[in-house]
């Protein structure tokens, strides 16, 4: 058995503690408990004052260092009399001897939490104010104590104070416990450093304009929930949250229902984004990350849901519903009669949640509007891919910039349907063809490895509704066969990016069919 293993269960008594905290939550109870257990407390600045004001004995750090706070408090603990007491490995006789010669006492416990840098940035504070909240001494003490975990226990959050007092009463922390605390401490400083580095890179020293994506990417995520399983029962899964991110599905409030699954989250995220791709009242129904139906309405959210559901009622069974509008009582009454896994919305009218809750298992989520800009990460073997979010903000996403390749200009109603179809394509896995009528998808061809099969699938799903409808393709038609599949079924107008070396042949096929064909010059692949 190694010495490390042999000491894992041995406790190290806590006789001397260093406390320096910005967040004073629980501080007095902690200090009082330590004092009553006979622990000597050394503390800094406002922390020492807070403790002393309650009549608890405390030694100000300047009494230990023999040096006052300077530079508006920027230098308090950066001193050998502090850091030698933190870094001395008391298992080593030579370290103990060195401390004795210098008249330095070791610390057994360090309790530190850091300046609120991220909160200051989020408050809209000035650059100088944010810089002042970059903690230097705090992380230095935390890292020193965590490195020296064989001799020192370190606690970085108030929710750990009860554990400190329990340890003091029972003889201290074991080595195994100190290792866990050290790991949490380094995680804490890593999160802090990533926040500072990311802010500096984006605010103080941004990349050159030509370099729109950063040379360095840092991020931290904390586990928020352990999920039952992943995409399949044999896969483990968990939900992690980014505390600095725009509040998204990971931060949604669940108002009712069973716990969310991995697949629930992926489908809800796809549905949520699809619904907010449109300015009008919109409902999107998603299954396996693809739309069963998307619809907009100028009448009501219930009308939008009815139209979206009618696109493919069979596939919508067990689907995920999202809307960019408040869920009405009328919509809730309809949804309550349909097997639905998840519904997510920015608001619910009074009574709507109660109606939906008739279904015991339906998951009802309240979520903030998703971001329209930013970047997306996708892990790959050995690294990750980063791209700008496809936000439907290209020039070609505005019908004003479309080119009429052939046929008569579309009337306002047809053009509105073409715009809706084009924006709906973004939510469909490529190759994607969407057939639309009256502000609703009536046929969706998704995820096919060639475009003609996507067109066939969209026509098949639309059935008789395809006659007189319009269609959109997320990428250009490489051959006329996909377009011909749509026109032969009765589609009267089509929008696609264009850009194929055979654009002229495709346009000729459209002209022959007597339809209007628009080119966007933009593309919306989704993989």
From Swiss-Prot:
Catalytic activity field: (6R)-10-formyltetrahydrofolate + 5-amino-1-(5-phospho-beta-D-ribosyl)imidazole-4-carboxamide = 5-formamido-1-(5-phospho-D-ribosyl)imidazole-4-carboxamide + (6S)-5,6,7,8-tetrahydrofolate; IMP + H2O = 5-formamido-1-(5-phospho-D-ribosyl)imidazole-4-carboxamide
Protein's UniProt keywords contain Transferase: yes
EC number: 2.1.2.3, 3.5.4.10
Example GO biological process: 'de novo' IMP biosynthetic process
Pathway: Purine metabolism; IMP biosynthesis via de novo pathway; 5-formamido-1-(5-phospho-D-ribosyl)imidazole-4-carboxamide from 5-amino-1-(5-phospho-D-ribosyl)imidazole-4-carboxamide (10-formyl THF route): step 1/1; Purine metabolism; IMP biosynthesis via de novo pathway; IMP from 5-formamido-1-(5-phospho-D-ribosyl)imidazole-4-carboxamide: step 1/1
PROSITE patterns: MGS
Record Gene3D superfamilies: 3.40.140.20, Methylglyoxal synthase-like domain
GO cellular component: cytosol
Domain MGS-like, residue spans: 8-156
UniProt family annotation: Belongs to the PurH family.
PANTHER family linked to this entry: BIFUNCTIONAL PURINE BIOSYNTHESIS PROTEIN ATIC (PTHR11692:SF0), BIFUNCTIONAL PURINE BIOSYNTHESIS PROTEIN PURH (PTHR11692)
Domain comment as written in the entry: The IMP cyclohydrolase activity resides in the N-terminal region.
UniProt protein name: Bifunctional purine biosynthesis protein PurH
The organism of origin for this protein: Mycobacterium sp. (strain JLS)
Gene: purH
